[in-house]
Curated annotation (Swiss-Prot):
Signal peptide positions (record): none
Name of the protein in question: WASH complex subunit 2
Region described as Sufficient for interaction with WASHC3, WASHC4 and WASHC5: 1-219
InterPro entries noted in UniProt: FAM21/CAPZIP
Length: 1317
């Protein structure tokens, strides 16, 4: 039945009932008749219902999610609204808070007043009276401080402050803001660099004191009184304000104008310095300051300004109170005194001490600075200041407090010690007042006032950068050494200039010259100042230890001591490290850098102190000018050190002083360098040499730094030096001579003193080896170029520096660039006797790098210029003996490229040298000026065979120019090689300024160009090595001549040394004459060598053709240069012996040209053999260095004798002759023994020489090879051959020199040259 009913029901569904979902009704109907169909239908129903439920749930979920999203969005909007309200409320809160404070206070006041109005209208008036009085007093103070009352009586007529009518009647003129607000220091000035406030902070502090008296005290009183009056109308505000106003009214009412009288007086005293107290003091201060400070108007202005700011109410109240102590000179009050007027006595410190009773703590830091500073300088100043105006000077103030309390002994020491040095008391007076004051505020003034005081300034600035800690102790030792310096009164005359300078500078020199301690007992004492601390300990240990300890102290010690030793010993190290820099280039650089870092870390003072120590070096260089060799070495070291410092300061100080210190230390130190150069450069070279010396300095620094860096290369170099030593079996003696010579370079005077050699024999023997190694490093292409620039730079620089020292003594260049420059100039001036050596030597040396040879050549020239410049070739040969075929050729190729440029440098240097050596320059420029231009055209591109003919006329002329223009040019021969690079832009015959400018820019550009040339030299080494094998075959027959030709290259590199040696020792000149003249007469090799020397004058076409065939254009050019250099050398050797080196150089060029003119070209043949010789040249170059150094020692000893007479010519002649003697013999032996190697080296050399840019270097190398054959002839031929040509071959030079330049054409196209052979 159920089934039936379902079935009956199913048909209407047209489908089985069990297959479709049943409805609820169906389920209910069939509930009684349940069947399987009902189960199926129920299942279907349930499934459908489940699906619907699920779908429904999903829909609800979606809706819920949408709701959540809406809710979140609403939440965000709500929060945004909250944030808006918060922002609004905060803004309104801030605004309301401001308004609320004002409104509430006013409301409270109004309420209180209203509550009390009935009671206290009278009280209110009484309460208002103090306020009104304060307001009036403040207003009057403002009028007094800010305005000058033209109508004083009208203002003073009213006894009551409240009367404003007559005040209105007052004619008020606003005061000059810059009375109270002085202008900042000159930008870039020492003070500007040293002081963070650049002179404004002190005055702001003074104004702060002034303003603090006016403003801070007045404002604080106003605030206090207003607060008190607001809080307690009748209580303190009435009492205090009434008392305050009573004081003011006593001043104002009693005077009726004390407000105005004070205004008048203060207006007047602002001008005068204060009211009665100030007017009294300022007159005495102004008188004392005018008497003592003399030059320090700005200090007085600052004092007056500070005082002007202070004649205010506090001036009246507190300063009147302070006035008695100020007058009394009480140590109790000196800081307040400083605030009032004691800063004005120390007007320069005025900022530091100036208004700063308030800022005594700051001043005390400065007091300690200046206590330490003033203790050296200000102790006498405090004596003088305390004696004439004890209260005011002691306010140096805090100085009296600290000096009297803690530093009376310092004061006494320095009073006695510094007054003991004649200059020191003179220095302390200005320096004590101003030199130390404001660190260097008065250094501007001090330079004029205290350039001799540079000792004090050195102390003070050294102490300044050693400011507080190191200074007190350092200065305490410093006064003791000064005492011992004053004990060494013999040296105190010099030491007075160098007393403190030796302290800061002589540590350098002491480290350089321990025997110079004996030379300069002051330096020992001053050294003891520093050696007491670190310096003499490290100095006693050794220069190396001194450099390491000094470097250690530079690094280990405080910046202060490090600066003393970092700047001074760092420079010592630099000077001694020029040899040592090879051992410790990085320590010296690190000391320099740390000195530079200290310069930055220890403030600008360190910088200045480094500059001071540089200046000290210059000063001691001059004070030690008797040891003018070391003086020049020091000068060059000073420049080298300064330059190194410049460069390391460029590295380190490039931050603050890359502009400031670079512009200052460079500009200033460079100014020192430059001003030494600029001052003398302006006179001797104009400023262009000064400009050149900056670049020169930079290059020196760079080259020296490379030398320092070349220590890295030294590792290579020692191995090469080993080979050099192997080759230099004889050369080791020469190397020892080199070492001694480099020692002499660094301590020319030391070696003259014989003890300095011990300085360097202790460390410089190692240094000598490393100096030789460094020379070898200099031989590296990098250093070759840089060293050539450096030697060029040093030639021009040392020449400029010496000429500058000679002419720069008047310190014509910017005093403000560096007071120390001024000081260094004055100190150099002060050391005029030595400077006379420098003067003669400088100018002469400018002409005749005697100093350049001894120093420029010994140190900068021998090590860098000759030893390095030539070592650039020779040392590279020594260092690169193994690599030398490449290195020498690289060198020679860069030198060839540089050669033309360096010949221009020779020219440029020749103008410098021409001052002393004008005859050569004068003789040759006529033929040379055109030739110089042709020489300029002789750039490596111009050196092509086609251009070679022009170039031969030009290049010999250039070599002649470089050398004859200053046969010191021969001494500059080594110098000239770098000088050619340096002087590329300026013709030798051109004016010195052009040289300086040319050298300046040329050095900069050439450093870069050389950097380019070095790879060229390397590439040229390979090319030249290939082609040199061809030319080697050519040159094998010419081996001795080629050695001679190569030797002249060494003369190019080393001739300066030979000449300085000859200059130093005419004996060596005679020796050089003996080998030089006999070689002319002696064996064919000698004649060939002499001919190679004389190639410039009469190159034998056959041999010259051989030169061309051999590709020895460079040998020819260089050989002719070297030959002519040797010829001129030989000529000048008798000339030097006769004292008419120029005349005899003219004579010998004629003789040499006549006798060996034919041989000149034969020598040109040997120059093709130069290709063989370069390795012998390497050996011989080492020998040259050894001989050079040994001869430099001779030259150093004899250079003093010959410096004055013929520093230029003698040095050139002697350098060549002297070098010609020893290296000539040794290198003849070596050439004989090493000619096969020479040929091998010639191959490599010409591989180097193949590069056109390095043609001249190649010539130099070949000249060195000639030097191997005949050392005398080598140098003469390398440097003098062309010089002789311009002399004898002025007419012949064009044709014959062109034939020489046919050889040059080979060098012009090194590849073609070899191919053209």
């Amino acid at each position: 039945m159920n089934r039936t009913s379902p079935d009956s029901e199913r048909p209407p569904g047209s489908e089985p009932v069990w297959e479709r979902p049943w409805s609820v009704e169906e389920i209910r109907r069939s509930s009684q008749n349940w069947s399987l169909a009902a189960d199926a239908g129920l299942l279907q129903f349930l499934q459908e219902f489940s699906q619907q439920t699920i779908s429904r749930t999903h829909e609800i979920k979606k809706q819920v999610d949408g709701l959540i999203q809406e809710t979140k969005a609403t939440h965000c909007r709500l929060h945004n609204v909250f944030n808006d309200f918060l922002m609004l409320s905060n803004t309104q809160f801030i605004e309301n808070r401001v308004y609320d404070e004002e409104v509430e206070e006013q409301a409270l006041k109004a309420e209180a007043e209203k509550s009390e109005q009935e009671k206290t209208r009278e009280q209110k008036e009484v309460d208002l009276i103090p306020k009104v009085r304060e307001a009036v007093n403040y207003g009057l103070q403002v009028l007094d401080s800010a305005f000058e009352q033209l109508d004083i009586k009208a203002g003073n007529s009213d006894s009551e402050e409240e009367d404003a009518n007559e005040r209105v009647e007052l004619i008020l003129e606003p005061k000059d803001l810059y009375i109270d607000r002085p202008l900042p220091y000159l930008i870039g000035s020492k003070l500007f660099m040293e002081q963070e406030d650049v002179g404004l902070g002190e005055l702001s502090s003074e104004e702060g004191s002034v303003g603090s008296d006016r403003g801070s005290i007045v404002d604080s009183e106003e605030e206090k009184e207003e607060e008190e009056s607001d809080e307690d109308f009748a209580s303190r505000s009435d009492n205090d304000q009434n008392q305050h106003t009573t004081r003011m009214s006593d001043e104002e009412e009693d005077d009726d104008g004390d407000l105005f009288a004070d205004s008048e007086k203060e207006g007047d005293d602002i001008e005068d310095i204060e009211e009665n107290t100030k007017s009294k003091r300022p007159t005495s201060f102004a008188d004392e300051l005018a008497a003592r400070i003399k030059g320090d108007m700005s200090n007085q202005l600052k004092e007056e300004q500070i005082a002007d700011g202070k004649p205010q109410k506090t001036m009246k109240e507190k300063k009147e109170k302070r006035t008695p102590p100020d007058d009394e000179e009480d140590i109790l009050f000196p800081p307040p005194k400083l605030t009032d007027e004691d800063f004005s006595p120390f007007g320069s410190r005025g900022g530091l001490f100036s208004g700063q009773g308030l800022f005594d703590d700051e001043d005390e830091s400065d007091l300690f600075r200046e206590t330490s500073r003033d203790r050296p300088a200000q102790a006498p100043v405090s004596e003088e200041s305390s004696s004439p105006k004890p209260g005011k000077k002691i306010p140096a103030g805090a100085v009296s407090v600290f000096l009297d309390t803690s530093a009376p002994s310092l004061k006494e020491f320095q009073k006695h010690e510094q007054p003991t040095p004649g200059k020191n008391p003179h220095l302390p007076t200005p320096a004590g007042l101003f030199d130390d004051n404001d660190d260097d505020d008065d250094n501007f003034f001090v330079p004029s006032c205290n350039k001799p005081p540079k000792t004090d300034k050195v102390k003070s600035t050294s102490i300044i950068f050693d400011d507080e800690e190191g200074d007190l102790f350092r200065e305490k030792p410093a006064p003791l050494p000064v005492a011992s310096v004053s004990q060494a009164d013999e040296n105190t005359t010099r030491a007075d200039k160098t007393i403190t300078l030796p302290s800061s500078k002589n540590p350098k020199l002491v480290s350089e010259t321990k025997t110079q301690k004996g030379l300069f007992s002051d330096e020992e004492d001053s050294e003891d100042l520093f050696s007491s601390q670190n310096s003499s300990k490290s100095k006693s240990a050794s220069l190396l230890s001194s450099q390491l300890p000094t470097s250690g102290s530079l690094f280990g010690d405080e910046d202060e001591e490090d600066n003393l030793f970092g700047s001074a010993p760092a420079k010592k190290q630099v000077s001694s490290q020029q040899p040592q820099s090879q051992e410790k280039p990085k320590p010296s650089e690190q000391p320099k850098k740390k000195a530079s870092a200290l310069l930055f870390s220890s403030d600008e003072e360190d910088q200045w102190n480094i500059t001071d120590s540089h200046t000290k070096l210059a000063t001691d260089r001059k004070s030690k000018g008797e040891l003018w060799d070391s003086g020049t070495i020091q000068g060059q070291e000073v420049k080298a050190v300064k330059k190194t410092n410049l460069f390391e300061e460029d590295d380190d100080e490039a931050d603050l002083f890359a502009i400031a210190k670079d512009s200052q230390k460079k500009t200033q130190r460079t100014s020192l360098l430059f001003e030494d150069d600029d001052d003398s450069g302006s006179s001797l070279f104009g400023f262009p040499p000064a400009s050149v010396p900056p670049a020169t300095m930079k290059k020196e620094s760079i080259s020296k730094v490379p030398s320092l860096f070349s220590d890295e290369e030294e590792n290579e170099v020692p191995s090469r030096v080993k080979s050099v030593d192997v080759k230099v079996g004889n050369g080791k003696e020469a190397d020892v001579a080199k070492v001694t010579e480099k020692e002499g370079l660094l301590t020319a005077s030391d070696q003259e003193a014989a003890g300095p050699s011990d300085l360097f024999s202790s460390s410089p023997l190692d240094k000598g080896t490393k100096g030789r190694t460094k020379t070898v490093l200099s031989l590296f292409d990098e250093e070759e170029d840089k060293v050539e620039d450096q030697s060029n730079t040093h030639v021009s620089k040392n020449d400029a520096e010496k000429g500058l020292k000679t002419d720069g003594r008047p310190k014509s260049t910017g005093v403000f660039q560096d007071e120390e420059l001024l000081f260094s100039h004055k100190l150099q001036k002060d050391n005029d006797p030595d400077v006379d050596l420098f003067a003669g030597t400088k100018k002469t040396r400018v002409s005749v790098p005697l100093d350049g040879s001894l120093f420029g050549d010994d140190e900068d020239y021998d090590l860098f210029s000759s030893a390095k410049t030539q070592p650039v070739v020779p040392e590279k040969k020594g260092a690169l003996k193994k690599d030398r075929p490449v290195s020498l050729k690289n060198e020679e190729a860069p030198e060839s490229t540089e050669g033309s440029k360096e010949k221009s440098l020779w020219k440029a240097e020749t103008p410098q040298d021409s001052s002393g050596l004008t005859p050569f320059k004068s003789r040759e420029p006529s033929s040379r000026i055109g030739k110089i231009q042709a020489n300029l055209a002789i750039n490596p591109a111009a050196l092509l065979p086609t251009a070679a003919l022009q170039i031969p006329g030009t290049k010999p002329a250039l070599c002649e120019l470089a050398f004859p223009s200053s046969e010191p040019g021969r001494s500059h021969g080594p110098e000239s090689v770098p000088t050619l690079a340096g002087s590329e832009e300026a013709g030798v015959s051109f004016d010195l300024p052009a040289q300086a400018d040319t050298l300046h820019s040329a050095n900069k550009s050439r450093v870069k160009v050389r950097g380019k040339r070095r790879p060229q030299t390397r590439a040229a080494r390979r090319l030249a090595a290939q082609e040199s094998s061809e030319s080697e075959d050519m040159s094998v027959s010419r081996g001795p001549v080629a050695q001679l030709a190569s030797s002249p290259i060494l003369p190019n590199g080393h001739q300066p040394h030979l000449q300085p040696r000859m200059a130093s020792g005419e004996i060596s000149s005679e020796k050089a004459m003996a080998p030089a003249a006999p070689p002319w007469e002696s064996g064919p090799a000698l004649s060939a060598v002499d001919r190679s020397f004389f190639v410039a004058s009469l190159p034998q076409t056959g041999n010259e053709a051989d030169l061309f065939d051999s590709g020895d254009i460079f040998p020819k050019s260089i050989g002719s240069q070297s030959m002519e250099g040797t010829k001129v050398k030989a000529a000048e050797t008798p000339a030097h012996l006769s004292g008419g080196s120029k005349e005899k150089s003219l004579v010998f060029p004629a003789l040499s040209e006549a006798s060996s003119t034919d041989d000149l070209f034969q020598t040109v043949k040997p120059r093709p053999a130069k290709k063989r010789n370069p390795f012998p040249l390497l050996e011989d170059e080492d020998d040259l260095f050894a001989d050079r150094k040994g001869k430099k020692n001779e030259l150093k000893s004899d250079s003093h004798q010959d410096i004055i007479s013929k520093t230029q010519d003698i040095f050139e002649d002697d350098i060549f002759a002297t070098e010609a003697v020893k290296p000539f013999q040794k290198k003849r032996e070596k050439e004989r023994t090493l000619e096969p190697n020479l040929f091998d080296d010639n191959i490599d050399i010409f591989a180097d020489l193949n590069v056109k840019p390095k043609e001249k270097s190649k010539k130099k190398v070949e000249a060195k090879s000639v030097f191997d054959d005949d050392t005398d002839d080598i140098f003469s031929s390398g440097l003098q051959a062309k010089k002789s040509k311009p002399k004898s071959q002025s007419a012949e030079a064009t044709s014959e020199l062109r034939s020489d330049h046919k050889v040059s054409n080979i060098f012009d196209d090194p590849l073609n040259a070899f191919g053209s052979q």
